[in-house]
Regions:
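Negatively charged
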Residues: 2-220
Length: 220
């Protein structure tokens, strides 16, 4: 017998093109404080709307939930600017591409945050359930002012951080980015050779397990 319209087994999308949370405990949920997004579970491609400030359906250990959106950056202050802040209900890892929150399906083709001041400000602020972030999560090579400000501030459970490939920096772009990440053992390499005012200010403050930070800039 031929079965028609059968649901395909396994993922039908590349979950690394989106912001994808991997649950490490049963009952994981995610909430973004501002901006509506779309989500799908286990890469099934069945995208559903998640309203601004709403909590996602729960998933269990080993499952994934992927997000995409065309999020609007609100305000222009370090306390309220950005697309919002995630609340993570249980322990998780995050992988994929943060640009999918700004550009949806086109995020994988975009490596510039030019003009996107405060874009990811406070995105994972005090997200103590966050454990690991994939290396390619922040692919932008051109940054904007305050774009990663406070991004992982207070993520005390964060063990591994994403690479930071940007070579074109702006003022305050990394300010407080990993402040208080007391479980972080290895800092991402900082490849930019030309800096901007306060670009690294307090970036790794109170990261008590770091032994060194490799930065490529030169002084004159």
């Amino acid at each position: 017998n031929v079965i028609y319209n059968a649901k395909p087994s396994g993922p039908v999308i590349n979950i690394d093109d989106y912001v994808t949370f991997e649950a490490l405990e049963d009952g994981f949920t995610v909430r973004l404080s501002r901006n509506a997004t779309e989500y799908c579970i286990d890469g099934d491609g069945d995208w559903k709307t998640l309203s601004s400030g709403a909590t996602s359906p729960s998933i269990n250990n080993g499952q994934t939930i992927s997000l995409r959106g065309n999020c609007t950056i609100t305000s222009s202050t370090s306390s309220t600017g950005g697309i919002g802040t995630f609340t993570l209900g249980k322990k998780c890892n995050v992988r994929g591409n943060a640009m999918a929150l700004l550009y949806g399906d086109s995020g994988k083709d975009n490596i510039s945050l030019s003009g996107k001041n405060y874009a990811f400000n406070r995105l994972f602020y005090n997200a103590t359930n966050l454990q690991n972030v994939s290396e390619n999560f922040l692919p932008a090579t051109t940054l904007s002012q305050y774009c990663y400000n406070y991004m992982f501030y207070g993520c005390t459970g964060l063990i591994s951080a994403p690479a930071l490939p940007a070579t074109t920096l702006q003022q305050y772009c990394y300010q407080y980015m990993f402040r208080g990440c007391s479980s972080l053992t290895t800092a991402p390499v900082l490849p930019a050779t030309s800096l901007q005012r306060y670009c690294y200010q307090y970036m790794f403050q109170n990261c008590s397990k770091l032994n060194y930070i490799k930065a490529m800039f030169t002084t004159t």
